[in-house]
Amino acid sequence: PVFRFGGTYNPMEYTFIRASYGQGYRFPSIAEKYISTFVGGLNIFPNIQIQPEYGWSAEIGIKQGFKIKNFQGYVDVSGFLTRYADMMEFMFGFYDLDGSDISDAELAAVVQANGFGVLANYLGARSTNIQNANIPGFEASIVGQGDIGDFSLSVLAGYTFINPTPINPDSAYLSTFSDPDSQMLKYRNKHMAKIDFQVDYKKVAIGTSVRYTSFMENVDKAFTEPLPGVVINGAPVEILPGYGTYRNARRTGDIVCDARLSFGITKTSRLSFLINNVFNREYSNRPGNVLHPRTVICQYALKF
């Protein structure tokens, strides 16, 4: 059985306090357990030993409405805690062709017998139970809208903090971290923030949004260091050559800005100009995946 409950309390006008608790249980999918495939240049291996994950999550928060002259909106603040047991996570590394574990010595023997080219067949991701995990955090947001003469202002801002860590991790699991000293779960950003601001004047609207994502403290170590025991022509082999240097140059995180301008031509049509990644920031949300450069879009919308 899975148990969940929640409630909301309204102690005064425009004030809402909420709390909730819920249990969760997830079986591994058929693909995670039995299917071997190749997606987007990456081998996906099955794991017949994988076990279901389960856990619970709790949240408490408050939402407060406000009005200051012609400006009104609400502020929302909440804290949360999630606990996982036998948490499932895709782990990148070398696996045997059937998805079972393969030692460095066995892998080196395969390369010696068949050449370096065969190594790609053993490299990929596999869903794996990573023991237990603890994810506390909090988030805050503000939404508001108001008028100043003929101008209409709207703002949306939010911030999220999480600190996901394993519970009593063993040394074998930590050895797969690019920075085991931090013990933060892989592929997570501790800080995320966003603000969106727009001004409307009659038929014209201009707006901007700014997003900040903190440095991803941990990824699979296989992406940042040479492959153990694999040497070609006297040089160590890397999966993503230079990625470790790329990460070290971006330890302050990424700030990405977008801008937009639109004109109401008639009551049923609108012309918009959008610029995504205004300052052409080069950034990545995971190893080997560089996100979009500056993009300019012209859009015409017509309502029938």
For each of these PLM feature ranges, what is it?
Residues 61-64:
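Hydrophobic transmembrane alpha-helices and their helix-loop junctions in integral membrane proteins
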Residues 8, 19-20, 51-59, 151-161, ...:
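Conserved C-terminal beta-signal and adjacent last beta-strands/turns
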Residues 70, 79-83, 100-222, 268:
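Gram-negative outer-membrane beta-barrel transporters
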Residues 47, 128-129, 277:
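Asparagine-centered polar/low-complexity signal
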Residues 1, 44-46, 56, 71, ...:
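Exposed loop/turn and edge beta-strand positions of beta-sandwich/beta-sheet ligand-binding modules
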Residues 9, 13-58, 72, 79-121, ...:
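Surface-exposed extracellular loop regions of Gram-negative outer-membrane beta-barrel proteins
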